[in-house]
Amino acid sequence: MMNRFIAYNMPKIELHCHLDGSMSVELTKKLLADMGEEYTKEELQEALTAPMDCPSLADYLKRFDLPLRCLQTKEGLRAAAEELALRAAKEQVKYLEVRFAPSFSTQQGLKITEIIESVNEGLKSAETKRDIHTGILVCAMRNLDRETNLSMLKDARELLGAGVVGCDLAGDEKAYPTSEFHELFEWARKNEMPFTIHSGECGSALNIRTAIEYGARRIGHGIAMKDDPELMKLCADKKIGVELCPTSNLQTKAIASIAEYPFTKFYEAGIPMSINTDNRTVSDTTCTDEYMRLTEAGMFKEAMCQKIYMASLATSFADDSVKQEVFSRWPLM
């Protein structure tokens, strides 16, 4: 069985990590204090971190309220992005794609491009301090109107290759099925903007199939296809990456127990997978924790490490030069 020392020190790639769900208690406390709002560390720990027996997805999502208030200024955005990349680098994450919804950071008048550039500045600062490469995924939100989402994507497209590596669709799958967003992703496809889509987190395999039909190169979560061999084969044949987030899926009841987690099914089906935190603070987790959770469940073995690393790299949205750099970080090549 792989031990924690190996899991912590081996090179890793993380492709599914939300900025607002990964702000530390300490940074959130500081940024709120700068706004004149005082909280104790204990109060913030309770407000930001969801319990393992989280009663509902709604309860999980309310943990994002305070962090989002901190992401309304350039300074807050820079600080959150830099901190996240440094935390990831500390546990040997060599490539990190950070996702967030720029449209949620406009409350104090920042433009979409200013918001994205601020996050990129924080990430690039971290890159000068640690051995890590980063990219930004901008999230369109299912609950926002078409005009808001499309306008954000158009602004973000101007920064593709200048920090931005692709886009995503996040939010309530049940209330806003992926089929409602064909126009958005047709625009992204025509404008050569790579995309992943949160799909199959809340029980809908149809959303996964729709995402693939629209041209998604990766699927966020993908749990709902665990009982659909045909869909698993489609993902494997098309080399569609699946972004696994075990702890988060347990908390939001996407699966009832770790014993039901489909890692082994997906692995044996030949689906390219990455192992991710989703939200480091909300789920109180790290990449190391995620690997160990699957290891302790008897699913992940040390012999799989290189295959997962290379599959994650292949399905990342990094450009070729970055991929070559990250490829070279695997010690056995």
Residue ranges of model-derived segments:
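Metal-cofactor-binding active-site regions of metalloenzymes
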Residues: 1-193, 203-207, 213, 217-218, ...
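Conserved hydrophobic beta-strand within the GNAT/NAT acetyltransferase core sheet
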Residues: 195-197
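Acidic/histidine-rich helix-loop elements
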Residues: 200
